[in-house]
UniProtKB/Swiss-Prot annotation:
Source organism, top-level taxon: Archaea
Keywords in alphabetical order: Cytoplasm, Methyltransferase, RNA-binding, S-adenosyl-L-methionine, Transferase, tRNA processing
SMART domains to which the protein is assigned, alphabetical: THUMP
Catalytic reactions on record: guanosine(6) in tRNA + S-adenosyl-L-methionine = N(2)-methylguanosine(6) in tRNA + S-adenosyl-L-homocysteine + H(+)
Any Pfam family matching the protein: THUMP
Gene3D superfamilies membership: 3.30.2130.30, Vaccinia Virus protein VP39
SUPFAM superfamilies xrefs: S-adenosyl-L-methionine-dependent methyltransferases, THUMP domain-like
Gene, per the UniProt record: trm14
Similarity remark: Belongs to the methyltransferase superfamily.
Native organism taxonomy: Archaea, Methanobacteriati, Methanobacteriota, Archaeoglobi, Archaeoglobales
Protein name (record): tRNA (guanine(6)-N2)-methyltransferase
Organism, as annotated: Archaeoglobus fulgidus (strain ATCC 49558 / DSM 4304 / JCM 9628 / NBRC 100126 / VC-16)
Cellular compartment(s): Cytoplasm
NCBIfam families to which the protein is assigned, alphabetical: Trm14_Arch
Amino acid sequence: MKRVQNLLVAVGLSPNYHRRTYPSGKKSLVVRFYATLTPGLEDVAAKEVESFGCKVEEIRERRGRIFFSGEKSAIPLLNHFSRTLERLNVLLLRCEVEGLDDIYAAVKGLDFSFVKGKSFAIRSLRVGEHDFTSMDIARVAGQAVIDSFMESYGERLKVNLNQPDVIIRVELVDSELFVGVDTTGDDAMHKRWWRVYNHPAHLNAAIACGMLRIADWKVDESLIDPMCGSGTIPIEAALMVRNVPNLRDFAYKKLCEWELAFEPNEVRLKLYGMEKFRKHLVGAIRNAVNAGVADTIEFRQGDATEMTGEYDVIITNPPYGLRIHRKGAIERLYHSFARAAKRCMNQNSRLVIITAEHRVFANAAEEAGLQCTHERFVKYGGLLTKIMVFMI
């Protein structure tokens, strides 16, 4: 626990730290964080962060960033139990800069005592127009960390670019500089521990969870993904309700020790996954078994355009048809699927999809008699996709 305090003391030396006094008279350390996430899901992630007792201070809409404060226990809790975040950083510094000299001075002014005896690496990001690169930022910031530690402790810190003990994020967005300690690591949170089979176009797990929250799916409602691929949506739905954490190792474990305690909820759910191709169906079942939720998901082989039954919530990530010669096939698929989905819906059912071909699907849904009740753009990789919700 002493190592935890070392990290937080470093935060305490910046203006981004205060102590909160509770009625009992006890004082609790409150830390400022910034998290990165899928652009377009900021409000969804903010609500999730608040459910962990954190206070959201700023939401950067469509920029994939939220800023908030919370107790130090938020570090393991959010890394393991957040469903929609990508990366959690302890915010060391946030300021305006004009160039590389300002970046060097800002970083050099921080206390890096928490890196003592450890290796570190800078991970840099640059957004906007500048006369230097992100590599220049990493070089200058790295030298600033080394110089700061040398002046304070007379030792040279070890640099390890491949497997550092501590990752320091130095990110410049236009003229605003953010410096933080990455508690997640190089692999973002959406890389789930349970995935042993990858569909060639599998859905980002954090986006899948965002869609579940946008759908306002409830535990007693039936849910199907009729084009489930490797099973991401029903698997994440089961893990969310059963309170199963992301069991990966995260970067914070090299800075502090925390015992992960959780009590899974063994509730049985009405979850269904349908997939046209047997290879992917078998892969989805393997993923569900590895996640420990195969007992509550019914997988079946079938065509989404011929789905039957009645479901409260339908959530899916259909093919986008990015190759020109598939455009016609995608239009036919969307029209057939929209009609099939409507047949399986009641007056309270919701159909939630994500696609880059949102105009095509909107037309298909309208022709099928579905009403769009919600839509939002979401940046998925290099694509501008749209999540849409439809009802009868």
